Amino acid sequence: MSFASDVKKELTGLEVHREHAKAELAALIRMNGSLSLVNQQFVLNVQTENAAIARRMYSLLKDHYHAQAELLVRKKMKLKKNNVYIVRLKQDTQKILADLDIMDGVVFNGNVSNEIMGNAQKMRSYLRGAFMASGSVNNPETSRYHLEIFSIYEEHNNDICKMLNYYDLNARTLGRRNGYICYLKGAEKIADFLTLIGATNSMLKFEDVRIVRDMRNSVNRLVNCETANLNKTIDAASKQIENIQFIESTVGLTSLPEKLQEIAELRLEYPEVSLKELGEMIPSGAISKSGINHRIRKINEFAEKLREKSA
């Protein structure tokens, strides 16, 4: 089961205040519903691939309107996909849709009602329903943090974006070939949204996975950095030894000034130690890392001049 499915499963188990639940129902119907005219009566079909969401819609219709709804199951034939669940309403359809401010007579309302837009708790419930209807969120294990809600109608999509930004979630809109999306980026904003709609357990799981993943990435970056530094140290030491051996084989180390000869002999004897450790081995007294670095640079310059002369 995907992370998005886990979130929706948690949401279907929430107990919500009666009036706030109507806002959730309005979102589910508006975003997943379709109307048809049968025998001069409007028939509403609300479709979902999630059985728990279908049961929740069915229960909300029964609880709020004592509606004689039907719960149907259809098997998708293409590509052997999941079942499709349909909540069908044949009676009092216009009355219920009018009460939810989805229709005014026979006219469809594209915007979310002012009653919902002006009430913080109802907005939260509407966003919960909107996410259950057509929301998705990436698994926190992935490298991209992304959550989106799809809408067919632009005005409705803009209202969802307004609601999200009422809670400072930095939501943005984007047109798609067959509709519009309102989306969130960033782990903190997504975690805030999950908390907002009541998916507390999913939020905690999201944060746990994100923290472990971010920590793992930090450790990997640290290891890579340490490895890069170690490789640089090894390369530098190899170059130093190569230059010292060249001096030794051409003019001998005794041709170096006494202080440089001292360093050269120690480097040949201890090729694996760091400059700091090398400085602590000087018989005449410890020298700082910068002091050792200065003498090594002089040895390298001496070797380069020898190469130029022998070329």
UniProtKB/Swiss-Prot annotation:
GO biological process: cell division; regulation of sporulation
DNA-binding annotation, residue ranges on this chain: 274-308
InterPro entries xrefs: Homing_endonucl (IPR027434), Sporu_reg_WhiA_N_dom (IPR018478), Sporulation_regulator_WhiA (IPR003802), Sporulation_regulator_WhiA_C (IPR023054), WhiA_LAGLIDADG_dom (IPR039518)
GO molecular function, one term: DNA binding
Pfam families: HTH_WhiA, LAGLIDADG_WhiA, WhiA_N
Ranges annotated as spanning the membrane: none
Claim: Cell cycle is one of the keywords in the record: yes
Cysteines paired by S-S bonds: none
Assigned keywords, A-Z: Cell cycle, Cell division, DNA-binding
Primary role: Involved in cell division and chromosome segregation.
HAMAP family cross-referenced by the UniProt entry: HTH_type_WhiA
Family the entry assigns: Belongs to the WhiA family.
Protein's name according to its UniProt entry: Probable cell division protein WhiA
Lineage per the UniProt record: Bacteria, Bacillati, Bacillota, Bacilli, Lactobacillales
Name of the encoding gene: whiA
